[in-house]
Amino acid sequence: MLHYLQNLFQALDVSSLTDAVLRVAAVFLCLTVHETCHGLAALALGDPTAKSMHRLSLNPLHHIDWLGLALMFTVGFGWAKPVPVNPNYFRKPKQGMAVTALAGPVSNLLLAILFLGIGKVIYLYAPYSAGINVFFEWCLFTVAPMSVGMGLFNLIPIPPLDGSKVLAMFLPNSAYGQLMRYERYGILVLLALSWLGLGGNFLGNAIYGVYEALFHIFFA
C-alpha cells in the first residue's frame, strides 16, 4: 500500500489513463466505505454526531481530505476527512472509541471479500465482453487488494490511525492520555517511516498474504 499508487500517472497512453481513473475510483470507494462505517458504528453505540453533520454519506466528496489524497498519490499513503465522534455519548468511552475505530478496517476487509465475490460471479456466469472484463479485473486486482491494504494500514497502532484507538482500549487511563497527547505528531512519524523505507516490506507482505488468502477462497 505504501508505494501502490506512487507511479499512478507515469505514462499517458489511453490504457494507463483508464487504469488511473479506475484506481482513483477504487480509492474513493474504499475511503468512503471506511469513513461511513466509522459513523455508523458510532451511531449504533449512541453517538449521533456524524449523522447530524451529514457524514453518513456514500458521496466520496463528503469524506475526501485533499491534502491526504494528494499524499496518497505521492508518498503512498494518506488519509480521509475523519468522521466526527463524540465519546461522551458512549457508555464506555474507550471501548466505544475502539469499536468505532475498528469498524473502518473491518469494513475494508468485508469490501474486499464482497468484490472478490462479485468477481467470482462474473467469472462463472457473465458472458465475455471487453467492458465486463475490465470490471472483472477492477474488482479482483484493484478494489480488493487496495481495500485490504487500507484496512491493514489503518490497524497500525500509531495515532491517528485506527489501530491506536484499538490499542488504547487495553491501556490504563494514564497511558491512554499520554498516547492521545502525541496524536498530532503521528502523521509526521508515518511520513518519516515512509521516507526511511521502514516497515514497508512488512506491511506489503501482510497485505499480500491476506489478499492472497482471500483470493484463494474464491479462486482455489
Range-by-range predicted roles:
Residues 1-220:
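Hydrophobic transmembrane alpha-helices and their immediate loop junctions
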